[in-house]
Amino acid sequence: MQPSRPVRPSAKAVVIHQQRLLALQLQDQDGVFYILPGGGQHAGELLPDALTREVLEETGLHVTCGDVLFVIEGAHGEPFHRVDIVFAAHLQGASTGEMLHPDTNQTGVAWLDVASLNSLPLYPSRLRRAIMRYAAGTAGPAYLGNECIGDPPCTD
């Protein structure tokens, strides 16, 4: 059993427009990678409100929050136990055209081809196939388990 760490709920957005997935582009010493927009829930804040706030801050885009699609955890390797609740989200209106509060290491915003997600560095990697199934209208598991370092890449 791991030492006690605080649990941090996080709301993440799956925004698909013209078969492309909205993602944050980040860069570290290992190169460029992508994550879903969204972030931590503040005390007293509802998850849909956290999602719309975070997406606006990170991308400059206004979205509405839809249904919960997936839950994935990050219980290892961080100072807290992250629980990501991943929602469908839909673009609304015009964008501000700027990242208001980009994430650490964020270099931009990208629209990734959904059909190619299995070969792109989108993390957590367990989301790749799940998002592809969702975009195709195919059901799959909602609970994706714990994100693990070294999760095998999806390459099929």
PLM regions and their residue ranges:
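Conserved N-terminal beta-strand and adjoining loop/helix that marks the start
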Residues: 1-22, 71
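Residue-level preference for beta-strand/loop junctions
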Residues: 5-7, 32, 79-83
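Residues that recognize and position ribonucleotide moieties
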Residues: 7, 14, 34, 61, ...
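Small-residue-enriched segments and motifs
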Residues: 11, 63-66
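A structural signal for short, well-ordered beta-strand segments
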Residues: 13, 68, 87-89
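Conserved Nudix-box catalytic region and its N-terminal flanking loop in Nudix hydrolases
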Residues: 17-57
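Nudix hydrolase/Nudix homology domain
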Residues: 31-33, 103-156
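Unchanged
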Residues: 41-64, 74-126
